[in-house]
């Protein structure tokens, strides 16, 4: 079970104008990203490695991170599996899986950036693949789980373009897989 529930539905006014989990939004905006994660009650899973014959989960150019697909792996290492739709996982369970994908992406970002998530300048794009029953047509709503996490953690830097598609199966029977394109700031040097 995720340590928090995000009800952030893409409304900047909701985030800026109201307390979030009892925390004043003005205070949240002034915090470093790592402190914000802690304040929001988020526990990141350990960063994962490749699940097949490739050796990087994230490729870094001077200002961009190209992130391989991340699966919904919980803090305890278990994987959210199954297809979403009639006779399978519910929309809400799919969104929870997408949240775990988002948390895994953030864990990889933190690892890749030496712990400095403030180097994230912009989450540019998410691409989500949803394991779906043929009758299920709400893949875009499943991906809200990942988008909500990005926007809660990175605020305006977390707003992104996004694509969502459905497929009949994913590697390891994962429910969702999400990859990301992230713009980063150069590391601080003296």
Question: Over which residues does each language-model region extend?
Answer:
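N-terminal presequence-like segments and the immediate start of the first folded domain
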Residues: 2-127, 132-190
């Amino acid at each position: 079970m995720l340590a928090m529930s995000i009800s952030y539905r893409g409304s900047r006014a909701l985030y800026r104008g109201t307390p979030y989990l009892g925390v004043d939004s003005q205070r949240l905006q002034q915090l470093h990203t790592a402190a914000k994660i802690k304040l929001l009650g988020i526990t990141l899973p350990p960063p994962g490695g490749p699940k097949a014959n490739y050796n990087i989960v994230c490729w870094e150019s001077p200002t961009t991170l190209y992130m391989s697909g991340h699966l919904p792996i919980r803090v305890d290492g278990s994987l959210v599996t199954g297809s979403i739709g009639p006779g399978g996982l519910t929309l809400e369970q799919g969104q929870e899986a997408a949240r775990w994908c988002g948390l895994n992406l953030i864990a990889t970002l933190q690892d890749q950036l030496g712990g400095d998530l403030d180097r994230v300048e912009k989450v540019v794009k998410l691409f989500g693949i949803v394991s779906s029953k043929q009758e299920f047509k709400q893949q875009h709503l499943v991906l809200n789980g990942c988008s909500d996490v990005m926007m809660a953690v990175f605020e305006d830097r977390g707003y992104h373009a996004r694509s969502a598609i459905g497929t009949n199966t994913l590697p390891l029977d994962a429910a969702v897989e999400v990859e990301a394109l992230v713009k980063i700031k150069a590391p601080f040097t003296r």
